[in-house]
C-alpha cells in the first residue's frame, strides 16, 4: 500500500490574493501621502463599503455652506487612484482614531468612511479588521486579518488576528 501526501496550496493562493490587494491598498495610501506632501493639501482615503471601493480625494480649497472642506477625486494618468477589494474580504471593523466606523450607522450599515492624510504627511490612526473567506482555517472559520496603518509612513502592517 502506498500513500501520497500532497501539500495544501489553496491556503497559499488565498494568502497571495490577499497580499496582492493589501499591496495595492498600500500603494494607494502612499499615493495620497506623497500627493499631500507635494501639493500641501488635505487628502482623504475613502472606503465605499457598498461598492467595495477605495479611492483618494484631494481638497479643493473650497468650503461648503457648513464650512466643511470640499474634495474631488484625485486624478493621475500613471497610477490607479481607486481600487476594489475582493468580495471574499469582509470588513468587520474600521477603526479611525479608536472609533469603529462600522458601528456608526444606527439600525443600518455604514455605507462609507474615510481617513485623512494631512499636508504634512501624517495620517489618522486607522485599524481595519477583516475576514478572508477564501482562507478557511482548520476550525472552519475564515482567516482573520488585521491591518494597522503607520501614521508616519502611510503603510499598513498586516497581522493574522484582529487589532484595535
Predicted features and spans:
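N-terminal helix-rich module
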Residues: 4, 10-14, 20-23, 34, ...
Amino acid at each position: 500500500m502506498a500513500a501520497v501526501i500532497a501539500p495544501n496550496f489553496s491556503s497559499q493562493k488565498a494568502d497571495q490574493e490577499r497580499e496582492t490587494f493589501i499591496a495595492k491598498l498600500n500603494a494607494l495610501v502612499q499615493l495620497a501621502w506623497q500627493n499631500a506632501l507635494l501639493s500641501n493639501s488635505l487628502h482623504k482615503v475613502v472606503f465605499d463599503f457598498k461598492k467595495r471601493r477605495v479611492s483618494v480625494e484631494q481638497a479643493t480649497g473650497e468650503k461648503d455652506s457648513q464650512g466643511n472642506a470640499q474634495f474631488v477625486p484625485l486624478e493621475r494618468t500613471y497610477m490607479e487612484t481607486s481600487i476594489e477589494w475582493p468580495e471574499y474580504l469582509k470588513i468587520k471593523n474600521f477603526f479611525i482614531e479608536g472609533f469603529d466606523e462600522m458601528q456608526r450607522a444606527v439600525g443600518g450599515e455604514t455605507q462609507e468612511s474615510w481617513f485623512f492624510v494631512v499636508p504634512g504627511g501624517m495620517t489618522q490612526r486607522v485599524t481595519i479588521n477583516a475576514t478572508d473567506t477564501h482562507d478557511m482555517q482548520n476550525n472552519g472559520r475564515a482567516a482573520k486579518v488585521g491591518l494597522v496603518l503607520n501614521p508616519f509612513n502611510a503603510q499598513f502592517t498586516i497581522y493574522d488576528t484582529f487589532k484595535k
